Curated annotation (Swiss-Prot):
Primary site of residence: endoplasmic reticulum
Top-rank taxon, per record: Eukaryota
Upper lineage: Eukaryota, Metazoa, Chordata, Craniata, Vertebrata
Name used for this protein in its record: Cytochrome P450 3A40
EC number: 1.14.14.1
Needed cofactors: heme
Enzyme class: oxidoreductase
This protein's UniProt keywords: Endoplasmic reticulum, Heme, Iron, Membrane, Metal-binding, Microsome, Monooxygenase, Oxidoreductase
Gene giving rise to this polypeptide: cyp3a40
Chain residues that bind heme: C443
Signal peptide coordinates: none
InterPro entries: Cyt_P450, Cyt_P450_CS, Cyt_P450_E_CYP3A, Cyt_P450_E_grp-II, Cyt_P450_sf, Cytochrome_P450_3A
Amino acid sequence: MGNFLYFSAETWTLLVAFITLLLVYAYWPYGTFKRLGIPGPKPVPFFGTMLAYRKGFFNFDDECRKKYGKTWGIYDGRQPVLCITDPATIKAVLVKECYSLFTNRRNFRLNGPLYDAVSIAEDDQWKRIRSVLSPSFTSGRLKEMFDIMKHHSANLIQSMKKKVDKDEPLEMKEYFGPYSMDVVTSTAFSVDIDSLNNPSDPFVTNIKKMLKFDFLNPLFLAVAFFPFLGPILEKFEFSLFPSSVMDFFFAALRKIKANHENNKQKSRIDFLQLMIDSQKNNQNGLQDKGLSDHEILSQAMIFIFAGYETTSSSLTFLAYNLATNPEVMKKLQKEIDATFPNKAPVQYVPLMEMEYLDCVVNESLRLYPIAARLERVAKATVEVNGLVIPKDMVVMVPTWPLHRDPELWPEPEKFKPERFSKENKDTFDPYTYMPFGAGPRNCIGMRFALVMMKLAVVEILQTYDFSVCKETEVPFEMDVQGFLAPKRPIQLKLTPRSASSS
């Protein structure tokens, strides 16, 4: 203690200067929204408002919407984030000014080998990659893939039957996860891993490791507190994603890509083959058109990641909603029986024309949106509907509170598919319902995910009823870490329709 008191004048000066600079650094960004006249929760040094994420970012967003109205400001570490729920402003950001001012999503860096994935890439690179991928998701292409999907949905039903025969509850994610994985790998790479019958398949175990993301991860916090560290850590190949998982998937995808390139007799065109063809069509020197080897691997990886998690989670929530709303399930089964009498094989066109099925899926996605937050970054300072948005500001649309706003959706907590009927569709603004995002940068796999979901639920309901059991948590508690998911697995029973009908 004595040594501390007898520091030299120069040491004291440096110490005071350091503390002053640290305090300035800690507090400097937190006047942004006050200067703009935008309300919001009070930030704390370095963390900003991130400590509130401990209650779940969706709960935090909901609290802010109720307290501050349609517009508010939060801080992810030192990064100001402008939150908007006004439909006109949302349309301007996501659609009207997408290409000119709000092209890019927020980039946390530390993406490892996924730096050039379509969901992360920016500006011209993103446009080029998106244009190459888009043909993979047309209605015509999905129709070609439908029989492959049906092969795996049949496996799903057969796998579920084993539990039904034992009169045991089913942990829904343990079935919908492998189903999603099998469909994605089959339609994307012509590879059949059959994870439904091989739950310990490394594709499944590794994807689960990747999904264990914590917003209070020390590496994530370091970049949030000190953004200048991002490029430095990236140079040293630090990543928010487990390196062992990335190494596994990229090694596997390299082998699959090599097999595609060496296979002279291509039985079918898949997602990977379309990307490889973009390279071959590009050999005339127009290097700005096709994808590089690394870009191909990154898109394949992000397709596995997004296809597995979003579809399996959405199917799990949908099954829960049907089990807890049996009158909706019975009405849906009537439509299924009318469309495919006597358990007739499900066909693509009539499936996609089922109106009540569409309402049911939309309502489930309203309650549990795939994309709970949509983000864009302003390229320049701009005024949108009277709201000044400074350059480099992150603009965020919180879909969870938007989808559950009682002013927009009467009785928002209730599962009411009729909200999306033809008669009611004109009663709400399309920019108040965005489970897959909106505009040019929406989810590219939206139609693919919807086909997978509709096929699975229709084939299950042709034979079974979803029902709650003693293991079912009603209502279930949401997990507050990472992605939108229940805290504990959702368990339901499947009851043969003949038994339940009688």
